[in-house]
Amino acid sequence: MRLLTYNIRRGGVGREEALLATIASSAPDVVVFQEATEPAVIKRLASGMSMAHCGAMPRYSLGFMSRIRMAHVEWHRPRVSRHAFLELAPEGMPVRIFGVHLSAVFAAITERRRMFELRALLRSIAHHQHGFHVLAGDFNTVAPGELLDVGALPRRVRAAMWVSGGRVRWRTIQIVLESGYIDAFRTRHPADPGLTLPASGPQVRLDYVFLPSTHAARLQQCDVIRSESARAASDHLPLLATLDVS
């Protein structure tokens, strides 16, 4: 199964042709969207890809489209979290997909919020912890040990960091790893920075796919899509993971 996670920025309005070209070039079976605030756009993208199954919940920002029929689709919002997550169960397959979009802005207070949201998500899916599942989406945070060139970031991002004291302890991804997951991209590309934002000249990696280390053998490949259309379609580059779902 080819799984694409893609933040399409502000619903993708006005950029559908570039989005469609980007998605088509990666030939996914399932796409998980972030900032999917315009259901009509998701429907048109699904139609353009001849994908019969799609959905979006504007207030939760998460959507999907798929060639594969889904046995179960649900948007969850943990009671203690501001952000929802999307649950997809492809029919006849042993995998469950959880679409994620954590709070934005690089600041100490928002990193603490992301940690809170992530822990709420992990508690909510604890009954799946031993099964084959995937966390995919825009985590809006930096992985441990990775460098961030603050000077190259947009002014609004630098301003948020300055307000928070200029220092952010990047703990969210560490929590994922300590919870028994592997970072799909980093597993396949130890030396590739894998930067995904901004798409026109990436400076930071915010988009991830994780799966339990007990199912690491099911990961076949994971790549950032760096096509010309991807640089124009959104402010994020999409991430494609290929999984063995036999």
Residue ranges and their predicted role:
Residues 1-9, 94-104, 136, 236:
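Active-site-proximal beta-strand elements of phosphoester/diester hydrolases
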Residues 1-47, 246:
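N-terminal, active-site-proximal structural segment of metallo-dependent hydrolase catalytic domains
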Residues 9, 37, 101-103, 139-142, ...:
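Catalytic metal-binding/acid-base residues of hydrolase active sites
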Residues 29-30, 132-134, 208:
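Short, Asp-centered acidic motifs that coordinate Mg2+ and/or phosphate
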Residues 30, 34-112, 116:
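Structured beta-strand-rich core segments of catalytic domains in phosphoester-bond hydrolases
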Residues 39, 48, 52-67, 79-82, ...:
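Active site of divalent-metal-dependent phosphoester/diester hydrolases
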Residues 65-68, 86-93, 211-213, 232-234, ...:
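Active-site beta-strand termini and strand-to-loop segments that position acidic
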